[in-house]
A protein has these predicted regions:
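Conserved HGGG/HGGXW glycine-rich cap/lid loop of the alpha/beta-hydrolase fold
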Residues: 9-62, 66
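Conserved alpha/beta-hydrolase "nucleophile elbow" surrounding the catalytic nucleophile
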Residues: 26-28, 89, 93-95
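Conserved acidic catalytic loop of the alpha/beta-hydrolase fold
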Residues: 71-88
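Flexible "cap/lid" loop of the alpha/beta hydrolase fold
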Residues: 102, 106, 113-146
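Conserved alpha/beta-hydrolase catalytic His-Asp/Glu region
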Residues: 126-130, 145-207
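Short beta-strand/loop motif that positions the catalytic acidic residue
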Residues: 209, 215-217
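Conserved alpha/beta-hydrolase "acid-adjacent" motif
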Residues: 222-227
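Catalytic histidine-centered segment of alpha/beta-hydrolase-like enzymes
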Residues: 246-259
Length: 272
């Protein structure tokens, strides 16, 4: 279904199951289907909400840069919750979705029953080359997403055996990745990739978080492992789950271990 948020952008939202609300928020360049392997299972006990961020998938794609920021994406989450009549919820954010989730938790802690930060960070990522980010943003805006994809495809493959295994062994996974990229807005890409590069470091502020928190990361997702450990150390009572044989998308790369970590946290936190 479509939910129109407060600035007029329509977001494609899918709700499955009943019970306590659980929002699963995808990352940069992702889609609501990034959690498709787990929705049926989780929806047995939870009201699972997934949606495409603006500029992604089946959601609206504003053409102005002012419509894209990490804070705006956070506002979208709250707008969707309000439209569904959900006062409080567990919030899981993956990658950029985790950056957004941490900001929602910091600014609206009363809305968050539990927080799951997945393969994400507390601030700028040291491994990210700011000049390359700017080059990619300019290419997206001036030459288009097709040209950008050709350049990205010609680059060095990700050093992630788990991801390569998915591409080789999971039927349709490569096509799934291609479809997601094909839906992306150039303005979104350029604006949000800069926002990710320039984000604030919220580690000290995260020490004030009081909701139950799980920090989850694939063991070979090297840009995010150290920041995940730092967040788990900073947030009072936080649990750290390092998923073996997984990189940036452990919900696909080691689905069973990911599901155990998430469901164990939900049960232990009495979010049921």
């Amino acid at each position: 279904m479509l939910v129109t948020v407060d600035d007029g952008v329509a977001l494609e939202v899918v709700v499955t199951g009943s019970g306590p609300a659980l929002f699963l928020v995808h990352g940069f360049g992702g889609a609501k289907e990034d959690f498709s392997d787990h929705i049926e299972d989780l929806s047995r006990e939870y009201r699972v909400v997934v949606f495409d961020h603006r500029g992604h998938g089946e959601s609206g794609a504003p053409t102005d840069e002012a419509s894209y920021s990490l804070e705006r994406l956070g506002a979208d989450i709250l707008c969707v919750a309000d439209a569904l009549g959900v006062d409080t919820f567990v919030l899981l954010g993956h990658s950029m979705g985790g950056m957004v989730a941490r900001k929602v938790a910091l600014t609206n802690p009363d809305r968050i029953d539990g927080l799951i930060l997945m393969d994400t960070c507390h601030g700028p990522i040291a491994a990210v080359d700011g000049d390359l980010i700017e080059m990619g943003a300019q290419i997206a805006l001036t030459d288009g997403m097709t040209t950008l994809k050709e350049i990205l495809d010609a680059g060095t493959p990700l050093d992630n055996p788990a991801y390569q295994r998915l591409l080789e062994e999971r039927p349709g996974y490569r096509e799934f990745q291609e479809k997601k990229f094909g839906s992306l807005s150039a303005v979104m890409w350029a604006t949000l990739v800069r926002a990710i590069r320039d984000q604030s470091d919220d580690l000290e502020a995260m020490r004030s978080l009081e909701m139950p928190t799980l920090v989850i990361v694939g063991e070979v997702d090297l840009p995010f492992v150290s920041q995940s450990r730092a967040m788990a150390d900073a947030i009072p009572g936080a649990v750290l789950a390092v998923i073996p044989d997984a990189g940036h998308s452990p919900q696909f790369e080691n689905a069973d271990a990911w599901a155990v970590a998430v469901k164990s946290f939900l049960l232990a936190s009495s979010v049921s």
